[in-house]
Amino acid sequence: VTLLLSKLLKEKSPDIFNAALALRRKTDVLPKIKKEKIFCWHESFFMTKIYCGTYIGEQIFPGWYYLYDLRKNPEDILSLNINNLKEEISKSKKWVRTLKANRSPIIMDKKYSMLDEEYKEIGYSEINKRYKLIEKHREELSHKLRIIDEEKFKDKLDFDQENKLARSEEHTSEL
C-alpha cells in the first residue's frame, strides 16, 4: 500500500514528492530554509494549513527554528520591546512558527501560498515587502525571541523544581 501511494504521489504531484524526500535528514533542513528566502510549509493540528514565510533564527533547542508567517505585517511587531513582544506572541493567530528539523518538513516554493485566500489577498508584492523588512531586522527579532524563550524555559525549570521539592517534602512528612 505504501509503495502504491508513493508511486501515485510521485506521478500526480512530483513537486511535493521531491520536497518530501529532500529533507529526510535533519542536517539538510537549516541550509534549505536559510537558502530559500520565502517558502511554504504546512502544519497539521486537526486540519492541515499552509504557511508562507521566512527563516528568522535558531531557537534555544537544537534543531528547532523560528519561522515568520508573512500573513502578519512585520511593521506591527518590529518596534515592540520584549514585554510587548511577549504579549503579542501569546495572542492567537501565531506569526512565529516553530520548525523542527527532526520532523522531515516539506519546504515548498512560495507559489503555493497562492492556494490560500489570505496570502492571495496579500499578494506577492506585499509578501516580498514584508520579507525584506524581516530580513533587515532578522538578528534583532531572533535575539528577542530567544530571550523570551530562555525566560519561559527558566521559569518552567524553576516551577518543576518547586513541585519536586514540595512532593519530596510531602513524602518525607508522611514517613
Where would I find each of the regions flagged by the language model?
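Short, surface-exposed recognition loops and adjoining beta-strand edges that mediate ligand/DNA contacts
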Residues: 20-45
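Residue-level signal for secondary-structure boundary elements
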Residues: 14-17, 28, 32, 146, ...
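Charge-dense, low-complexity intrinsically disordered regions
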Residues: 147, 151-168
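Conserved small/polar residues in nucleotide/adenosyl-binding loops
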Residues: 171-175
